[in-house]
Amino acid sequence: MKTVLHLLNTNTYSGAENVAITVVRAMKKLYPDYRLVYVSPDGPIRERLNSEGVEFEPIEKISRKEVRRVIKKYHPALIHAHDFTASIVSAYSTLRVPVISHIHNNTPWLKRFCINSVVYGLSTLRYKKVLGVSPSVFDEFIFGRFIRRKSEVIGNPIDLERIRDAAESAEDKRGYDIVFLGRLNEAKNPLMFLEIIAELKKRRELKAVMIGDGEMRAEVEAKILELGLGDTVELLGFVSNPHGILASSKVLLMTSSWEGYGLVAAEALALGKPVVATPVGGIPTIINGGEGVLVSEVPEFVGALESLLTDEDKYCEASRLAVKRAEKIDNLGEYAEKINRFYSGE
């Protein structure tokens, strides 16, 4: 049996973690000769991994010492490292074990000549393969032209059955008009979300929810008070299974400054929810019709949301198209086949 370590730098559940768990589950089901171990710092992610039946090896932090300890324990045939930190540490921890670097977002420093881009660029010499969730990951990487032979756009695994089962089994099924689902960080631009809600509140009553945690939580809490949104926006923090709330709500609002793929948009479509989002990263490959709206400015967001929330016929049509679009991007079997090809060295 071939052991593959999925290495991540975070201890909570969000986009990259979702992808890693989906890959592990799919590979276990379709290619049972693999032993797949999820390796990350311990924390809230443990509960999610237990519920998904994913083998977990907790580490103190991402470091060469800890990665080498885990390698010695499991003797892996391959390390599948998710995002930049895990990839770089893996590259400099072992010369013996092949590493696949899987990049889930196109952070702004990718475009610049800086210490981060140089360190990651040098680390790519060690990778067996570099996977990106959208073309923008490689198009915007300042050293992207040097890794063309080993880079491949793979998108994200979309498992409609798993998404819908998660929504059905969720304990929390409270419904809201508008949902923010993601980390509270610069990439997801949560302050813009609040500005949009404040403007929309001037036109109609509504209830919004923010699901997720992160380094901007204090700023978000302060902004909610500043804009007088205490009775309008509920800040839930990390929720281990947010799909029940998403399924019971009306619209997903994504205000991201940058994205890799935008997996939560696909999850919303799977649950029949229209998406209003910024046209960044892979989002335009997911939302390309009446199932959602792509806009960039606060007034445009407000107009699109007001239209969906007040026009029942328009909302129902967008919901129908969301389900239809989700069926087209359901790709779990095809995705697992690609991963198996990479693991097998083909």
Predicted regions and their residues:
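Short hydrophobic beta-strand element within catalytic cores of glycosyltransferases
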Residues: 38, 274-277
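A conserved mid-protein helix/loop that constitutes part of the nucleotide-sugar donor-binding site
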Residues: 14-25, 180-204, 210, 215-221, ...
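N-terminal strand-loop element at the rim of the active site
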Residues: 6-62
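Carbohydrate-associated surface elements
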Residues: 136, 157
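Aromatic "clamp/platform" in nucleotide-sugar-dependent glycosyltransferases that forms part
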Residues: 238, 257
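Conserved acidic donor-binding segment of nucleotide-sugar-dependent glycosyltransferases
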Residues: 289-299, 307-312
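A charged, aromatic-enriched C-terminal amphipathic alpha-helix characteristic of glycosyltransferases
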Residues: 15, 313-344
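Short His-centered aromatic/hydrophobic patch
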Residues: 81-87, 103
